[in-house]
UniProtKB/Swiss-Prot annotation:
Highest classification ranks of the organism: Viruses, Duplodnaviria, Heunggongvirae, Peploviricota, Herviviricetes
GO cellular component: host cell nucleus
Name used for this protein in its record: Tripartite terminase subunit 1
Species of origin: Human herpesvirus 1 (strain 17) (HHV-1)
UniProt feature coiled coil, ranges: none
Pfam families in UniProt: PRTP (PF01366)
Amino acid sequence: MAAPVSEPTVARQKLLALLGQVQTYVFQIELLRRCDPHIGRGKLPQLKLNALQVRALRRRLRPGLEAQAGAFLTPLSVTLELLLEYAWREGERLLGSLETFATAGDVAAFFTETMGLARPCPYHQRVRLDTYGGTVHMELCFLHDVENFLKQLNYCHLITPSRGATAALERVREFMVGAVGSGLIVPPELSDPSHPCAVCFEELCVTANQGATIARRLADRICNHVTQQAQVRLDANELRRYLPHAAGLSDADRARALSVLDHALARTAGGDGQPHPSPENDSVRKEADALLEAHDVFQATTPGLYAISELRFWLASGDRAGQTTMDAFASNLTALARRELQQETAAVAVELALFGRRAEHFDRAFGSHLAALDMVDALIIGGQATSPDDQIEALIRACYDHHLTTPLLRRLVSPEQCDEEALRRVLARMGAGGAADAPKGGAGPDDDGDRVAVEEGARGLGAPGGGGEDEDRRRGPGGQGPETWGDIATQAAADVRERRRLYADRLTKRSLASLGRCVREQRGELEKMLRVSVHGEVLPATFAAVANGFAARARFCALTAGAGTVIDNRSAPGVFDAHRFMRASLLRHQVDPALLPSITHRFFELVNGPLFDHSTHSFAQPPNTALYYSVENVGLLPHLKEELARFIMGAGGSGADWAVSEFQRFYCFDGISGITPTQRAAWRYIRELIIATTLFASVYRCGELELRRPDCSRPTSEGRYRYPPGVYLTYDSDCPLVAIVESAPDGCIGPRSVVVYDRDVFSILYSVLQHLAPRLPDGGHDGPP
């Protein structure tokens, strides 16, 4: 018998199924916003039914989602809430636009309203964060702006009250409703993959760095976590394949549509897409062929005619198809445009055959605006018949094509062009009468101009078989070298040509290697920019972690306020004497140097924010690792990182320098402005708390007094929270210290719990001592005088 499934697992499965249904509805909304409104009018009954279901679902789930937001968020609950809000908002707007179109009949006005063309950009959200050190204003424009702000808020959680953080997170949530709640597909204007996320940083920390700094590696990083690439494969014959199985059509209509589709595809079928010779080169070859055809063995051979024949030999004998690089790297953007036109023509033909009208979709209604876009915008928008990978390959081929248009590379990559140019020069000289005479009985050319043209065209730049025979012929008998000054000059010229050819060949290889390396480096960015992107789980998970940390503070204060016994030292009489007594007794002692590493880790644990919780994982890492991720992800300056790392070691618990707070002014930031000074003051307060509790446990021998955070407790399956006894730092300036000295056996706060509120480290330690005194071996120390 199978084991029963737990209740949380069942709830999670139901939420996942619900999330899939809402995503499907959002996808339908996005399609109908861009579809011909006449088609949308035909779907009004189904659309209204879906809108009513979303209303009912939102009304039923909203109280539970709000309660969970105050308890413990999960990425699943965050995503579902965002989708529900977006589906409700945009579904109602689409219904209103369709009803307006039913009366007005204006297609352009419908798309202007549904696509928000007349409204300002919705992806600009101002965020205000109130901290103890002042107010911070930011603007969210990209998805990575949200992630960066959440990381910054996580780092500044020490100096941010829960109320201020909750208000700022609400503004972030409003931005995420339009950005993340709009379904799976990420709008291109929202994604900026050049900014690495926290997951990118963590991946680089566990991979080999090859001697490069983390900052340099991050600069070359293309983020694929906030948004993830989706492989899109387009079938060119999709319409032809699925049209025979379309429902709701008669056999006659289906047959007529198939016939029209086949006819349209046959009419729009283009060429083979292979490169063809230019008309100019073709005319030169025809002229040369005509001269050669008019000659026979009974006629005398002129030097020019012999040069033409030799050049035609090189043009005909060379295997150009296997050597040309242009075939592999030629631009194919025209072929993509032709494919788009073929797809559009086929779709329109089928629409006319089936419905008797051409549908006015968004891209057709605003076709003139789309046609006015430049090439970059058109590539980002994409097409219906070309996948992003096709566009990327076309762009890369265009890069090679542009690179190979330089004269040197063009002649090296396409040697036949040298022969074409030489042939054109010989024909021009023959036409001008420069080589019309000097009959020759079948020997090679002796005209210097024609010979040089032939050598440069066919041999000078590395044509097949060029150079070896001539060099042997120029050498004397027995290969003893040149015998005349003319032979020396000829050999020197041949050496120059050979060195030029070798240099050009090396230059070409280097140039193409550099271009290939550049293309490989930039291909990732091209793929991220042009491919279809879907939302990853980074943003919902980051938002949930940060929001849970601040919600835990408010929940902890609310739960402790309902304890059976609450002692509030913030306004109690006689607390000053307790403060003075405990302060004097602790300042007489020093922290054992052997304890400095452990209390340093305790300091890192309290300073670290709620986002990076590596110390709580199954394979836990020390607290300094989580703090390292926290400070590096916000770009903390090196001198501040050094100061933070040595904060505990600098004090060491010696003297009275570590006791920085005045009576009832612990975690007070009055008179301090600025994020960094306030953050440094918070570090001092936390150091004071750690050293004081360490000395307290050492002096009074009461065992280790636990310092805890309010977000250390996770809800149980019953929704209850367990807070073990200890001193809790709430990071709230009104009530920064809460001591739980007694609690129920299960660890939950209830009628048997005893809680102490305080704003002073030493007075709260004295209250803890009073409750521990009956259990101490010596009955405790005397109280204050």
